[in-house]
Curated annotation (Swiss-Prot):
Residues 421-440 are annotated as: Disordered. The gene is leuC. Its cofactor is [4Fe-4S] cluster. Binds 1 [4Fe-4S] cluster per subunit. Pathway: Amino-acid biosynthesis; L-leucine biosynthesis; L-leucine from 3-methyl-2-oxobutanoate: step 2/4. Its EC number is 4.2.1.33. [4Fe-4S] cluster binds at C348, C408, C411. Heterodimer of LeuC and LeuD. Keywords: 4Fe-4S, Amino-acid biosynthesis, Branched-chain amino acid biosynthesis, Iron, Iron-sulfur, Leucine biosynthesis, Lyase, Metal-binding. One of its GO terms (biological process) is L-leucine biosynthetic process. The lineage of its organism: Archaea, Methanobacteriati, Methanobacteriota, Stenosarchaea group, Halobacteria. GO terms for molecular function: 3-isopropylmalate dehydratase activity; 4 iron, 4 sulfur cluster binding; metal ion binding. It holds the Pfam family Aconitase. The keyword Metal-binding applies. It comes from Haloferax volcanii (strain ATCC 29605 / DSM 3757 / JCM 8879 / NBRC 14742 / NCIMB 2012 / VKM B-1768 / DS2). This is 3-isopropylmalate dehydratase large subunit.
Length: 473
């Protein structure tokens, strides 16, 4: 195996050929599909009388359009029911494993892949979804792909891609109380910009990253795309291996763990690996970060003032003015006290069990503010069941939260869970674009799960560090 970064090693390991276009044809170890981006690709196969080449390397779920209040069939939304039925037919005819709502394993695609043990270090993973970068937390190269590429992978298990540069982002020190992985990635995007990663893959490293659990690493890799990067990853280590041991695949195939671990160790970036760029951030100086605008890069520390547009680079001034007008915020003020109408705990960024535990620690013994509708949407049916086994559902329900079924929910306006009018939401999701949560007048403030919980019970953006937290639920 070649020397260098994990990206170099895994790329070379999966190279089938170098194409005349300058792209590389890569073998894909795992192809994840869902109901939104796969139908057209299956249609293209049928037009050409082609079959799925490796159904055993393909796994399907339904997440974007599935309702979270009532998943009984047929769905109330005719379009959602049609997409679900088409996916069911496609996977049945192709012999593809499908985690459907009756399986007990359904959930957001980037939650179920890791929890089932399908996601493994040194893999190449693709999915017709921009947040496929989530799987990079395990030391995989994971890329979101378009419909024509989905077709190619279904037919050949390969994809044509251009190799990118690698930027190492070192987050040093120890994160302080109330500061989570979500704050780290929001700060990275704030500093480097939403286009700062264009042409790059991000390697996350440093003590603060190494100290994170796997769920925290997934949150960071998940939002690499919001920073403009093609993908993001963390080198696998003992934290990775211990987490993998508990997954379905390795519980059923324990011998494979010992067989694969030498490969996992070999693909770690070498200590003397050369990077195209290195950025260092002192994690000990970070505080909870929230967004004030309409892109994930328009963020600010909870105690810091919202920037004046004229103080920003010229190319960012007009978008900042428009964002501040839409959000109704004032330069020079902080986001503390910004009133919210909705609190949303969910999405492929922050809907895993540790996220829910931390939020429950804030919620326990408190009540959702009268002016707020609050919901918890677990990332998968397994997360939901595990949370219920710990009594987390009762903590949330007693506080006034709605406890929903698994799905993408209010992360995007593609299902029944949406903002209404100019409602403002405190959201643990990954995007705050205008209209993202269903209403063109809606306002989304991104933050970590604890901060969402704090906003839910106070009715406004609140520094969670000021609330006494119940750490044992």
């Amino acid at each position: 195996m070649s020397e260098g970064t994990l990206y170099d090693k895994v790329w070379e390991e999966h190279t089938v050929s170098e194409l005349p276009t300058g792209q590389t044809q890569l073998f894909c170890g795992l192809h994840l599909i869902h109901e939104v981006t796969s139908p057209q690709a299956f249609g293209m196969l049928q037009e050409r009388d082609l079959e799925v080449a490796y159904p055993n390397r393909t796994h399907a779920t339904v997440d974007h359009i599935v309702p979270t209040s009532d998943q009984s069939r047929p769905f109330r939304d005719d379009a959602a029911e049609e997409m679900m039925a088409e996916l069911e037919q496609n996977v049945r005819e192709a012999g593809i494993n499908f985690s459907d709502p009756t399986s007990g394993e359904q959930g957001i695609v980037h939650v179920i892949g890791p929890e089932k043990g399908l996601t493994q270090p040194g893999m190449t993973i693709v999915c017709g979804d921009s947040h496929t970068s989530t799987h990079g937390a395990f030391g995989a190269l994971a890329f979101g792909i378009g419909t024509s590429q989905i077709r190619d992978v279904l037919a050949t298990q390969t994809v044509a891609m251009e190799k990118k540069k690698v930027r190492k982002i070192e987050v040093t020190g120890e994160l302080g109380p109330g500061v989570e992985a979500k704050d780290v990635i929001l700060e990275i995007i704030r500093r480097l910009g939403t286009e700062g990663g264009v042409g790059y893959v991000y390697e996350y490293a440093g003590e603060a990253i190494e100290d994170l659990d796997m769920e925290g690493r997934m949150s960071i890799c998940n939002m690499s795309i919001e920073g403009g990067a093609r993908a993001g990853y963390v080198n696998p280590d003992e934290t990775t291996y211990e987490w993998l041991k508990e997954t379905e695949y390795f519980q059923e195939n324990p011998e494979r763990f010992d067989e694969l671990k030498p490969y996992w160790e070999s693909i770690r970036s070498d200590e003397d690996a050369e990077y195209d760029d290195v950025v260092t951030i002192d994690g000990s100086e970070l505080e909870p970060v929230v967004t004030w605008g309409t892109t994930p890069g328009q963020g600010v520390g909870i105690t810091q003032p919202i920037p004046a547009p004229e103080d920003l680079p010229e190319e960012k001034q007009e978008t900042a003015r428009m964002a501040q007008e839409h959000m109704g915020v004032t330069p020079g003020e902080t986001m503390e006290g910004y009133e919210i109408d909705v609190a949303f705990l969910g999405s492929c960024t922050n809907a895993r069990l540790p996220d829910l535990r931390r939020a429950a620690g804030v919620v326990k013994g408190r009540q959702v503010a009268d002016s707020v509708r609050a919901m918890v949407v677990p990332g998968s049916q397994r997360v939901k069941a595990a949370a219920e086994a710990e009594g987390l559902d009762e903590v949330f329900k007693e506080a006034g939260f709605e406890w929903r079924e698994a799905g993408c929910s209010m992360c995007l306006g593609m299902n029944e869970d949406q903002l209404e009018g100019d409602e403002a939401s405190a959201s643990s999701s990954n995007r705050n674009f205008i209209g993202r949560q269903g209403s063109k007048d809606g306002r989304t403030v991104l933050m970590n799960p604890r901060m969402v919980a704090a906003a839910a019970v106070t009715g406004e953006v609140t520094d969670v560090r000021e609330l006494k937290e119940v750490t044992t639920v």
